From Swiss-Prot:
SUPFAM superfamilies: Ribosomal protein S10 (SSF54999). The keyword Ribosomal protein applies. One of its GO terms (biological process) is translation. Pfam families: Ribosomal_S10. GO terms for cellular component: small ribosomal subunit. Belongs to the universal ribosomal protein uS10 family. This is Small ribosomal subunit protein uS10. HAMAP family: Ribosomal_uS10. The gene is rps10. SMART domains: Ribosomal_S10. NCBIfam families: uS10_euk_arch (TIGR01046). Involved in the binding of tRNA to the ribosomes. InterPro entries: Ribosomal_uS10, Ribosomal_uS10_CS, Ribosomal_uS10_dom, Ribosomal_uS10_dom_sf, Ribosomal_uS10_euk/arc. Keywords: Ribonucleoprotein, Ribosomal protein.
Amino acid sequence: MQKARIRLSGTNPATLDEICNQVRGIAQRTGVHMAGPIPLPTKRLVVPCRKSPDGEGSATWDHWEMRVHKRLIDLDADERALRQLMRIQVPKNVNIEIVLES
């Protein structure tokens, strides 16, 4: 049987967990085997920049960062489950990637 590997990524871990709960609910309603959500390592993007706009004075720096959280879900690829999965309302700041594997 085919499996669907769902990879979620976003900057807000609460919205990722909310979508994972929706996927878990779909798996329970349709009776499909689900593994996960597996939290993957968080990627931390740091951008250092000078506070002073003109370059004069002491070298003081601001450090801006963005954290990208990821989750991985394995789901048996049942047609009913995948149709319901496509109807989930995904926020703009969450990236969802579905790969079918045999």
